[in-house]
Amino acid sequence: MSEKHPGPLVVEGKLSDAERMKLESNYLRGTIAEDLNDGLTGGFKGDNFLLIRFHGMYQQDDRDIRAERAEQKLEPRHAMLLRCRLPGGVITTTQWQAIDKFAADNTIYGSIRLTNRQTFQFHGILKKNVKPVHQMLHSVGLDALATANDMNRNVLCTSNPYESQLHAEAYEWAKKISEHLLPRTRAYAEIWLDQEKVAITDEEPILGQTYLPRKFKTTVVIPPQNDIDLHANDMNFVAIAENGKLVGFNLLVGGGLSIEHGNKKTYARTASEFGYLPLEHTLAVAEAVVTTQRDWGNRTDRKNAKTKYTLERVGLETFKAEVERRAGIKFEPIRPYEFTGRGDRIGWVKGIDNNWHLTLFIENGRILDYPGRPLKTGLLEIAKIHQGEFRITANQNLIIASVPESQKAKIETLARDHGLMNAVSAQRENSMACVSFPTCPLAMAEAERFLPSFTDKVEAILEKHGIPDEHIVMRVTGCPNGCGRAMLAEIGLVGKAPGRYNLHLGGNRIGTRIPRMYQENITEPDILASLDELIGRWAKEREAGEGFGDFTVRAGIIRPVLDPARDFWE
């Protein structure tokens, strides 16, 4: 592994322009406040275009009408995506009612998009509504700080509806980690919440004046569920319990899925085990991992700036020893843990506290009133009467949590009446896509708009081969940045060009193996032809309980990725 080829602790060379931008931004202020008042353009200019990402927003435009507007000599229809900070995906029904109203009244698309990072996004916020959205969030105890760009992003936590006490403890740690790693700059409060500037120099004791070299993602995981896909993340705390009570965490570092087409210096990587730590060291260890990456991460090349590349460059043992030094601890040996699945259990589940939890399947996380299926209205009506909370899952679904027996029938009636409990196949429940077109500027191929009809065709293949109740973990991502987490799927499609994808095979159901590229730059008919043949073989030749991804590896159809830094592209 990495120790065979240790590299420098710090990469020397000309810093990327992003580093200049951060340094000159006055702790993320830039000239955003002035830009807000420029009515000549619907977008943000210069450095502000990137700086708003630190405030939880991306500037986008509707790519479906981009060419048409260009012909009319109009600028693109700029609008912002805003992503809320929501550790563990827990949101109150009061907060839900507020975001429902904002989506309806102040966004182009009128939808709420649940993401696979356990939060929600608004798409289509015009510039005039940017400040009001931050103020609305603040009024209900939410914010969008540090949900994008070079910071610790939204902290995920297993949406475990069974063991309520353990989930509550893990969720509290997810919140503590999130708060501890937040930026300290007052820029967010000054710009969006009109808080007074104070005569105190900003300091960033953890993140530093130029923040992190690249995005950084953290999870808290409760085995045996790997619903949050820990191997997609930089830093992972795997909960270890004794007698149902949380006692500590196993730490895994250096996961990440983003690649660049054709760039063999990039690769998807699973996280590496560092060791076990008692609870009282959690925040010190989290800070130590982040500051080590802050100081050692590559600031000359953003394509090689994530923690996974730092770990490979300096060596796992070197990185681990530095974390131990900074945190003032020695990791204990990894404690036993096992993952058995990562899908959500759709429907009602009774928790150990005798409350009920209803997990609703939301295809691709898009909450909108569809013809005959008014999902958004249904959730609003549930929010008006539900005394518990909602939980957004990392599979883009929604849990109506902590429902007392007395409310169960009423909530189920509302859900059914609004199309929120329509029967779907196991295959559809285990399929997921990122947003992609028309709003994502990085999209190379369709994802969210492509997946439903593509799933229909995969369902037909399963039916053809006599296994209609089976499922394959299937993900579509519109570009190699990998937001759809296709690089941890059994079938992963990565957008290459309009209507064309790279097909990856060989991941597994529990999300612990990176799939390898099987075919490159192929169309939907080619993909379906390959899947028809391979699913047919799987149906006939599989061993008892063997998932599709495991079968493709065992049958020699695809070689497993064992050491991504060296064999991902082979």
From Swiss-Prot:
Molecular function, one GO term: sulfite reductase (NADPH) activity
Documented EC number(s): 1.8.1.2
UniProt entry tagged with the keyword Transmembrane helix: no
Binding site residues for siroheme: C483
Keyword NADP on entry: yes
Domain of life where this protein originates: Bacteria
Subunit text: Alpha(8)-beta(8). The alpha component is a flavoprotein, the beta component is a hemoprotein.
Protein's job: Component of the sulfite reductase complex that catalyzes the 6-electron reduction of sulfite to sulfide. This is one of several activities required for the biosynthesis of L-cysteine from sulfate.
Name of the protein in question: Sulfite reductase [NADPH] hemoprotein beta-component
Originating organism: Salmonella enteritidis PT4 (strain P125109)
